[in-house]
């Protein structure tokens, strides 16, 4: 979910070219909903290249994190996805009940992204972009991509979407029974 928010920020900045990005994003994020965000096509290569740079900005991260917390606190139980949800957003009040960390080889991940992009971008470019983004996410100063200690590791290289969901579902069932 946080990835979508950063992608939405990138789309807005690319399309509207504001002079002051932070003021612009604060205003845009005041009254926004998940439904408003998912209406947009946010998985273009142009947005993907822009989002990794934008996500390093501490002020942008603060705006996105505040929106996430508002949305999370509105709900009693919620499923949230993002590269720093367990490590930065839901570390306390509310704290996550369960965290997953997904690992996949660059080759498989790039191929899957390439298919998502309907093969409109050369696979070589998708691979290069994904490698750079993952590197930037892991090395950024603010909220780097890390696996939290108690996260359940799911290696998705050799798993179908159905198999990944089954693993997650089993883990969720165990937590809900306790």
Regions found by a protein language model. Give the residues of each.
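C-terminal alpha-helix
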Residues: 167-178
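Conserved AAA+ ATPase "SRH/arginine-finger" region at the nucleotide-binding site
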Residues: 102-105, 155
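ATP-dependent small-molecule kinase phosphotransfer cores
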Residues: 4-78, 84, 89, 107-111, ...
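Phosphate-binding loop of NTP-binding sites
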Residues: 91-96
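Conserved AAA+ ATPase "sensor/coupling" helix adjacent to the nucleotide-binding pocket
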Residues: 112-117
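Phosphate-binding beta-loop-alpha motif at adenosine-nucleotide cofactor sites
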Residues: 97, 147-163
């Amino acid at each position: 979910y946080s990835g979508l928010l950063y992608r939405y920020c990138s789309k807005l900045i690319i399309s509207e070219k504001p002079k002051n990005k932070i003021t612009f994003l604060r205003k845009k994020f005041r009254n926004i909903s998940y439904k408003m965000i998912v209406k947009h096509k946010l998985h273009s290569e142009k947005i993907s290249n822009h989002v990794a740079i934008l996500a390093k900005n501490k002020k942008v991260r603060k705006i996105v994190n505040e929106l996430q917390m508002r949305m999370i606190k509105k709900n009693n139980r919620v499923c949230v996805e993002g590269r720093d949800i367990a490590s930065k957003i839901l570390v306390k009040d509310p704290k996550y009940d369960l965290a997953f960390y997904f690992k996949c080889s660059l080759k498989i991940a790039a191929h899957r992204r390439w298919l998502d992009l309907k093969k409109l971008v050369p696979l070589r470019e998708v691979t290069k972009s994904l490698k750079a983004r993952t590197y930037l996410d892991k090395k950024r100063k603010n909220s780097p991509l890390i696996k939290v200690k108690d996260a359940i590791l799911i290696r998705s290289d050799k798993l179908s979407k159905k198999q990944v969901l089954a693993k997650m579902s089993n883990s969720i069932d165990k937590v809900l029974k306790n």
